[in-house]
């Protein structure tokens, strides 16, 4: 049973949220955004909130505790910058690479957000990181997590890798401090989407899968490597209802030969679209009025997320972001292009105007910047 007051306002269409506790509504948005990212819905029972809080993994993602910093409990106020990193771990002994790097910027009003991605192949200077015996150097951005995660004689530590990645992203963007961060296991996407009963999203163009057959099984590797053999799963342009494996597979695609002409930039756009689609799905009546489904989503989300709110819990942040909805999240595309040295591809670089975007984020001038640069708004978002 849902807890709360019954009844509706005259002349107003009843909300599916009527009678749902405020904490339950607001945990939806932040939980979903965190799950890229994302997805969790909390409705009806205090026990669900407790389960969610207890299920979410926690780690020292920014090195605060290791540095002796105290975590002060105070009100969460904007502006906020939240770093969201998706990983796709295959083996526990393999250092993780950051497959998706997103920043959610929330202005001081705390009622909307700007979501933008940094190319994982962005060529950057990665600072030295003595904890992992890394001396620093120039490499692709996603490698920062791998370098930082290394622990002598042990399996890699993703939380430590996140710390170096965060330092590198701060260096790239000029953002002095992240207010929260999360590591999302991409495999968890599948479980979350399936727990929600699938996700509805718009496919902007026909895309074929590099890795999956139409039935979801893996395609056969070519002898000697260099690609795959056999029929490919296809995602046709238009409205689609995707299962967990389909959603995860779709947002992984990045090759022009398979229908993604802008490569990793296209994949970033699809990931952002997927985040918003999951937010919408989480607010659907089918999810918010079904405690059994909610409980499944909770458990799937908690198992897929490591969170650090620098003294605040994920529920604290969800409450603080109570006014954000899917239609108030603006997805941003950062212009860039390839870096080649002696004809060989070495990664990506951002255009100079991206520095102006980062400055607008830092100085709370993002609205004025977007008015002057409407082309930064992601298409089909």
Regions found by a protein language model. Name each.
Residues 1-381:
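Non-catalytic, solvent-exposed segments at the cell envelope interface
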């Amino acid at each position: 049973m849902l807890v709360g007051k019954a009844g509706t306002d005259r002349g107003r269409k009843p909300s599916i949220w009527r009678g749902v506790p405020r904490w339950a509504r607001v945990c939806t948005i932040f939980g979903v955004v965190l799950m890229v990212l994302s997805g969790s819905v909390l409705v009806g029972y205090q026990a669900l909130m407790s389960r969610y809080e207890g299920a979410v993994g926690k780690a020292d993602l920014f090195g605060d505790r290791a540095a002796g910093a105290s975590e002060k409990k105070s009100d969460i106020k904007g502006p906020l910058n939240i770093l969201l990193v998706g990983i796709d771990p295959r083996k526990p002994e393999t250092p993780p690479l950051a497959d998706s790097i997103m920043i959610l910027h929330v202005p001081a009003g705390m009622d909307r957000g700007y979501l933008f991605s940094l190319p994982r192949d962005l060529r950057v200077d990665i600072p030295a990181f003595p904890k992992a015996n890394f001396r620093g150097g120039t490499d692709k951005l996603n490698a920062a997590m791998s370098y930082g995660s290394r622990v002598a004689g042990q399996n890699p530590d993703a939380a430590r890798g996140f710390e170096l990645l965060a330092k590198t992203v701060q260096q790239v963007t000029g953002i002095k401090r992240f207010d929260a961060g999360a590591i999302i296991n991409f495999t968890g996407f599948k479980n979350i989407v399936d727990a929600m009963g699938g996700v509805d999203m718009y496919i902007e163009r026909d895309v074929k899968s590099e890795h999956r057959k139409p039935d979801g099984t893996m395609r056969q590797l070519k002898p000697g490597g260099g690609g795959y053999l056999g029929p490919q799963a296809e995602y046709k342009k238009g409205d689609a209802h995707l299962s967990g494996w389909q959603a995860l597979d779709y947002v992984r695609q990045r090759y022009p030969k398979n229908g993604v002409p802008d490569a990793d930039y296209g994949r970033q756009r699809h990931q952002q679209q997927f985040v918003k689609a999951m937010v919408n799905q989480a607010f659907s009546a089918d999810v918010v009025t079904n405690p059994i489904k909610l409980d499944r989503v909770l458990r799937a989300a908690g198992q897929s997320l490591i969170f650090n709110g620098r003294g605040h819990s994920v529920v604290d942040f969800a409450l603080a972001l109570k006014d954000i909805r899917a239609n108030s999240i603006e997805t941003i595309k950062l212009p860039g292009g390839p870096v080649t040295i002696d004809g060989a591809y070495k990664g990506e670089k951002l255009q100079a105007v991206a520095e102006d975007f980062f400055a607008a984020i830092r100085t709370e001038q993002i609205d004025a910047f977007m008015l002057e640069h409407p082309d930064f708004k992601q298409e089909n978002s």
